[in-house]
């Protein structure tokens, strides 16, 4: 390999690293996180339905020490992350429904090479939270929270805007991912 080619590869690698959102660079894959929104506050965390017609869909629930509220972020090597829970394990990833009654709502499914499972974490313009988007729907659709109705407190992707339901806080816990370095 020529020196020019080595230099070009090194520069490309550096540029890829620099283009990764600053917040994404600080995710520690060895620990679980809890997720909350500015809209509902720190006392409500993202959790997973266990059973029934909404099995594996997500919702905000009061903060508890339950495995469905512990989220793991695993980098894909391109600045995106797969999200899984302690509850369902690393084989079930957060994905987005494409169509139907639950269109644009996140749910846990078997992990695979699906762009709905590739999540971007972008620091908000104000710097007081992060926005969560997927490669599937693109940077113009942000994870927000239903306010009222049958889906109250459940997340869904909507057009990004200046809404506190789209400003998420990722709180690192002291719970280590088993087998993580």
What is the meaning of each model-derived region?
Residues 24-181:
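Lectin-like carbohydrate-binding module/patch detector with strong preference for beta-trefoil
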Residues 1-11:
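Bacterial N-terminal signal peptides that target proteins for export
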Residues 19-21:
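N-terminal signal peptide c-region/cleavage motif recognized by signal peptidases
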